[in-house]
Design a protein with these regions (language model features):
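RNA-contacting regions in translation and RNA-metabolism proteins
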Residues: 1-190
Length: 190
C-alpha cells in the first residue's frame, strides 16, 4: 500500500502554492522527492512519495511547507522549512474563541499591532517568521524561536500589555544570546 498524505489549504492560496509556471510546486516536489496533486476547486492537496523514496519524513516535511503556504506565508518563507532544524507552529484562534469573528479580529489586531509593529518586534526578537492569516497565527523558525514567539502571541491573546510582551521578548533575546555565547565557548575543538 502506498503512503499518501492529504491536506487542505484555502483556495485563495492555491496560486501561491503552484507559483508562476508551477515553479513553487516543482521546487517542493524536488526537495522532498514527492508528487503533489492539487485540486484547485476543493483546495485538497495530495502528497505521494516518488518511487524509491522510502523516507516517510519527507512527506511530513512537504506537508508542513504546503501548510505554511496555506497559512499565508510567502513560498520563500515557507522554504525555510526545508531545513530540518526549522519547525512550523500554528495557533488556531477558533480553538480559543470559537466562531466569534469580533474576538478573532481583535486578537489579530493586537498581534499585528499598529502598522505591523508588534508582529515585526516578535519576528526581530525571536528570529521567527510570523503570518497572521484567516483565523490562524503561523510561526516558522528554530524550535526555541517559535516557542518564544508562541508564548508572546499567547500573552497578547490573554490581554497582556504590549510593553509587558516587549519586555518579555527582550529578556528572552538576552537569554538566547547568552546561551549562544556559552555554546560557542564550550564547543570542543575539532
Amino acid at each position: 500500500m502506498e503512503t499518501r498524505i492529504n491536506t487542505v489549504i484555502p483556495r485563495d492560496r492555491i496560486g501561491a502554492l503552484i507559483g508562476s509556471e508551477g515553479t513553487v510546486k516543482d521546487r517542493i516536489e524536488r526537495a522532498f522527492d514527492v508528487r503533489m496533486t492539487v485540486n484547485s476547486e476543493s483546495g485538497v492537496i495530495e502528497l505521494l512519495p516518488n518511487e524509491g523514496n522510502n523516507d516517510p519524513v519527507s512527506l511530513l516535511k512537504a506537508k508542513d511547507v504546503v501548510a505554511a503556504i496555506g497559512k499565508g506565508f510567502a513560498p520563500e518563507k515557507a522554504f525555510i522549512l526545508f531545513d530540518d532544524d526549522k519547525v512550523l507552529d500554528v495557533l488556531d484562534l477558533r480553538d480559543l474563541f470559537g466562531r466569534s469573528e469580533t474576538d478573532i479580529q481583535r486578537v489579530k489586531g493586537r498581534i499585528i499591532g499598529s502598522e505591523g509593529k508588534t508582529r515585526r518586534m516578535i519576528e526581530e526578537m525571536t528570529d521567527a517568521n510570523i503570518s497572521v492569516y484567516g483565523h490562524t497565527i503561523g510561526m516558522i523558525g528554530g524550535y526555541d524561536a517559535v516557542s518564544t514567539a508562541r508564548e508572546a502571541a499567547e500573552m497578547l491573546i490573554k490581554g497582556k500589555q504590549h510593553a509587558t510582551v516587549y519586555k518579555f521578548l527582550r529578556i528572552k533575546r538576552r537569554e538566547a544570546k547568552k546561551k549562544m555565547t556559552l555554546e560557542l565557548w564550550e564547543k570542543p575543538p575539532g
